[in-house]
Each structure stands twice: as structure tokens, then as C-alpha cells.
């Protein structure tokens, strides 16, 4: 189970063929592999040793794929970083990981220079553009000046392949350690749930720096199908590419599907080739799922995962019953349990914490033994997500433990309230949080985003909620925003909403 073998296995099974289309240029699997070997040899010549950490901070491009495979072939460890992060977060990752090199773009060089201050481990800044910038190494020169033969290094399945830093929504980002076995097994198991047709072509819109995008890329090596790669998600550009290449599907996040429903941009393009999409990274509301499927006649298969599980835990299988609101069934080789506070299995249908076991589960957090001991116990990953399982083995995600709202002793699941808010025709996005209350302990506050041109009042929305919810589940406070704060892959940043509320109260 060696992640660096994926490209070679693809060539052995399917021969030389186009794997990626980027900016209308076709990249074959052989071309990507040879460039990965050149980069690996170049990194070794720079002094990168097995076990060293190398950061990759780029927008999506074939250079990211080459960089990942090249780093692994040099025996080093990939540190993917979302280019949208600020200098402080990048500095923390560079320092915590003790990275020896970073592969980035000239566009982010100023950010790297600020983040790099006082970090002694970082020896090389590699720039992907064909520019001669003092103090940097030219990525094109590394490829041009080194052999395309694979370095003779032994890589074991339990060697670290990636340290994936969490988004930091609950504090300082933690480095999730993932081995070759973790990621390879997850790619294989995920691929087993797919049934692509020979002519299927996908659109890759997810950041390759995120665990979801990383596994979609890894699983893609298991098939002979092409993928069109976008630097970053842009709705109009995505629609253009879907029409041009007759895209049959893409893996996305709920915010993307909601955007496609509420925007009129898709109306100007022929998107009839779409047949099946996948959703993950954040809960998909039933309203968004139904709205997307009705508008585009394309089904969405929702799944669930987290970085600590490499990341996929469950999905809807294409040939099985779909249950709206469910995150599907566990993927092959992955076990799940729903347990109470004493680690006892709860009865079917009852809520408890979702715990996971399998070859995909991380060995822990980098340099954080205390956090590792709390989250990984007796071979099980304690996700912190509250869920329930039905009689058919389908999982239903309820909420993060820390996001449950307790109003006068009643447990409120934010998603229940958000589903009702999404039913209102004027609302295109919504999130709720618990805010302190001296009498009830907590009260519910809703943040809503209205569709363009819509004019409704907080009382209108309260009335709508009272028609669908118990009184104690109806938001006491409603605030309008132009957009919800979301992570780069669409997760609602509830921490920022809590901070926003705290500032208003000051």
C-alpha cells in the first residue's frame, strides 16, 4: 500500500492516456509520472531526505499532482496548505511541521516571506513559474535538469505520507498524520463504491490541498477516466467546462450545489450531461439536494468523512437505495459504531457519538500526544460527531458534540433548525448557533442570507419557524448577512459566528 505507486499502477492497467485536462491542455499519466520522478530527484539533490516535510501551497494545477507524487517518491512527507490561509496560519504550519522546503507560486511569495520569519528549518522556496527570483529555486529547472528515473528508495506502508492540518475552526490547526496505508486504502475503498462508465468525465473543483480533494484525486488513479481540473471553483467557469467537455459529474460541497440552484448563471449553459455528483465536507440539506436534482436532473450521493479518517467513512452506493438526509453506509473495510458517554453501543435509531475503525484511521496528531490520546482510543477514532444508524445500516449525522444547543435543558440540533430555514423561499443560506442566556442557559440565534431582491423581516422568518418547529426550537434572534463565513471547502465557520455575536454584544 504505497501511495507513490498509484500513477504507475494506472499506466500498467490502462496504458498511456490523458488523465488530466487543465486550461485546455491534456496531460497523460506518463507525462505526470516522469515529471514526478524528475522532481523527486531534484528534491534529493537539494538535500531533502526521507521523512523530511515539504509544504505545497498552490492553486489546483497539474503541478500539484506532480509535486505530491514527487515528494512521496523522494521519501518525504507532503504538507498540503490551502493558499487562502493567512501569514499567521502558514507560519504555524511551517514551524510546527519543521518543513525543509515549500513548493509555491510567485503570487504567494510575499506571504511565504512574512510567514517564514524566524523559521530555521525552511531551506528551500521552490517557485513553479519560469522566473529567476533571488532566494528561490526554479521548479521548471528542477524538472529539466533531473532524471525521469524513479529514485531507488524503499517506502513502507506505515511510513507517513501526509500531514494534513485541520482548518483551525476550533483553535490552532492540528497536524493529522496520514500514512501511505491510510490514504491508499481509503482511495481503494472509495473506488469500490464507484461505478463509472467508460465515457464518464469528471470536473475536479475541490482544492487538492484538502483531504476530500486529495482522496478524489487518489481514487481517480483507479480508473481510466479523464478529469478536467479547475484552479478553484468559479460557478460560471464550471458551467462553461461542463458544457464544453460534457462533464458527467463532480464531487462538491453543499455550498456549490446551493449556488447552482439559486444563481441564473447555469441557465445560460447546457448542463444536461450531468448525471451524478457527490457531496461531502459539510451536511447537505434535503432542500438543497432536492432543488439541485429537480433543476439539473442529476442525482447527488452524499457521504461523510474527516481528515483523521483519510477522510472517507461512508457514502451512498450508486446501486443501492438513497435516503435523503443520510450520509450513507460505511465504505468497504471501515467499521463504525454509535456509542454513549460510557462507550456502550446505543440502540438503533438513537443518537450517540460516531466512532470509526479501519486501515484509513490516522495514527494521531503530529507532536500532540495528549490530543492523540483523547481522540484515538483502543483502535477507534472518536469523531466528536453525533449520529444515529437505522435498521439498514444507513448513518444520519446529527451534529458536532460541541455545536449542540441546550435551551432550558432541551437539546437542539442546529441542522434541524437550519433545514426549516432553508424551506423559506427567500432564504438561500442559513446557520444557527447557541448564544448565552441568563435564564435558559442558551438561546438560538439564526444567521440568514436572503436571495437577491428578497425583502423579508426577522418576524416573517420567526413566523415561518414557529409553523414548523416547537417553540423552544424557534430562534430567539435573527440576523441578516450577505454571506456566511465558510472554510475553503464550504464548512460553516460557527466559531466566527460566535465571535461575531460576541462583538455585537460588547
Language model feature labels by segment:
Residues 329-333, 344-375, 412:
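Conserved ATP/PPi-binding loop(s) of AMP-dependent carboxylate-activating enzymes
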Residues 41, 85, 102-104, 242, ...:
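AMP-binding/adenylate-forming catalytic core of the ANL superfamily
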Residues 28-31, 161-185:
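Conserved AMP-binding A3 loop
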Residues 8, 16-61, 65-69, 86-91, ...:
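Conserved AMP-binding/adenylate-forming core of the ANL superfamily
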Residues 25, 41, 45-46, 73-141, ...:
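Structural core segment of the AMP-binding/adenylate-forming
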Residues 184-201, 209-248, 259, 263:
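Conserved AMP-binding/adenylation subdomain of ANL enzymes
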Residues 222, 247-252, 261-322, 335:
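Gly/Ser/Thr-rich phosphate-binding loop
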Residues 16, 126-127, 146-165, 172, ...:
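Conserved pre-ATP/AMP-binding loop-to-beta segment of ANL
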